[in-house]
């Protein structure tokens, strides 16, 4: 079991919380803030920033590595779930 919590270097301003359901705990980053950071610091377009982060950062490296979330209100969350399940051919019923 890993005993370290890792961070995404250069993205401290995008930290929005801690996942305390795993050991070790994981930092939680807001994806849209990470995109904005790259756009400002590296003069990237939004599309380039998303591509870079998707390829280099937004996947699970294992225990202790960060989680990446998109913050939204409940209506947006339910709508996103509906779209996701619809794309998979399901009904998207949420209990």
Task: For each feature predicted by the language model, list its residue ranges.
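C-terminal alpha-helical interaction appendages
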Residues: 1-94
